[in-house]
């Protein structure tokens, strides 16, 4: 596959403002070094590591590491991302929302961070972007996506989500509702046609009928898929009577990084990629995180225990932040999970097959899209997982959403 050439703006990057937040007066930038050999292209996005050499007043040289995430390309998928305001939403979260969430904890004596620090370039590069600290340079790592989160990693992720959710609930209590960019996310009537395109079930349904359990589920899924987007829009219309939070909505193995100490224990967890955040029931994030990225052996076996673990930390954070409204009950979360079967269905039919692909397989362009979709649903790991997941969902009445 032909690798796209580096964007033209790479040679004109200026990071003076970003660097100033790290250095003292008298320090000066010696060089800005985009690591073009490490550039990654995926999903109409370019990820570019940038090294900055700073000469300090004592003449020693300090290296700072940033990561630039920018829109790339003008194809159909790029236009969809622009229409759905994915970079606009993520920029707003990094620069406006996360700092305020962290300030809520800071005000009660707790140091909690949710993701990398974000900065602004000195001048426009002609495309939307997110400039952030490079967590890899600080020792953060992803888990192997094919294996997913083991029990300890999963607990760390759920604890971080509980803190994130609690902060969002207190934020709304203190400052009022989120703007429409976050309250509705991508799930707006105006986006129905695009959502229909993105959720085309043809590849999934054509392979489903070939599975051992496929004949049992194919007919009902084919009928349900006809109204899936319509039902999604209704599901994601937030219910003011339920306990609502800002959901990450894309919390899978690739979008979480961990920092370990010398003993191999997690000392910090960072969330990444806030392009599709949305206000609503925490059931959305619980299904997304556990069903997409928990290790196969714990995905279903530990599901209820992990919901309870999440709830414990949610309550802990709500109390720490002095949440003034009625506290949710565990039964409320369970009831919401039972009502969000469609959310679970979308995760296992749209997200799980991607998480089980090899890393290189999702770094493709349009020419490879149809071949990739086919390989997603013929992947033996995915079929084996679904042989367990679909009966589990059926037993819990999570497939009755039509």
Q: For the regions a protein language model found, what residue spans apply to each?
A:
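Conserved ATP-binding subdomain of kinase catalytic cores across diverse folds
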Residues: 46-48, 53-197, 282-283
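Phosphate/oxyanion-binding active-site loops and adjacent basic polyanion-contact surfaces
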Residues: 7-11, 40-47, 86-94, 157, ...
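Active-site acidic catalytic loop and adjacent metal/ATP-binding pocket
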Residues: 45-57, 228-282
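ATP-dependent phospho-/nucleotidyl transfer catalytic cores
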Residues: 139-248, 257-263, 367-402
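Regulatory N- and C-terminal appendages and interdomain linkers associated
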Residues: 1-43, 53-63, 222, 234-237, ...
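Generic recognition of stable, solvent-exposed alpha-helical segments in well-folded globular domains
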Residues: 89, 152, 156-159, 242, ...
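Active-site activation/catalytic loop segments of kinase-like enzymes and analogous catalytic loops
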Residues: 92, 96, 276-320, 344-367
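Short, flexible loop/turn elements at secondary-structure junctions
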Residues: 36-40, 52-54, 72, 120-125, ...
